[in-house]
Regions:
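Short, basic-rich loop-to-helix N-cap that marks the start of a DNA-contacting helix
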Residues: 41-54
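Short alpha-helical DNA-recognition segment
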Residues: 18-39
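A short, Lys/Arg-rich alpha-helix, primarily the initiator
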Residues: 1-17
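Residues that mark the N-terminal boundary/hinge immediately upstream of a DNA-recognition element
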Residues: 10, 19-21, 45-48, 59
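Short, charged recognition helix plus adjacent turn
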Residues: 65-92
Length: 92
């Protein structure tokens, strides 16, 4: 079973929180492919992650944030602040 802090766990957590079955993603992915993602057997491309996120009606970064924080609010705040600092330091 994947750790609570992983993309497979975040996918499953978000899907269940939305009350969706794996079959609900049939327009963007097969049930078997989604199952392999949730079990950590494959990694999605950014395009596939975006398509899955659209079905979940969340931003792809939300899934990534859940992947790194497990949904812990303090960790979400800390990671958001870090990302803001790092982007600012790039001086784009």
């Amino acid at each position: 079973m994947p750790s609570k802090r992983s993309l497979p766990a975040a996918l499953k957590m978000a899907r269940k929180a939305r009350g969706l079955s794996q079959e609900a993603f049939s327009d963007v992915s097969s049930r078997t492919y989604l199952s392999t993602l949730e079990r950590g057997m494959k990694s999605p491309t950014l395009n596939k992650l975006a398509a899955i996120s659209r079905v979940l009606t969340i931003h792809p970064m939300t899934l990534l944030m859940l992947s790194y924080t497990g949904g812990n609010n303090a960790e979400i705040d800390a990671l958001t602040a870090r990302i803001r600092r790092e982007i600012s330091a790039l001086k784009l």
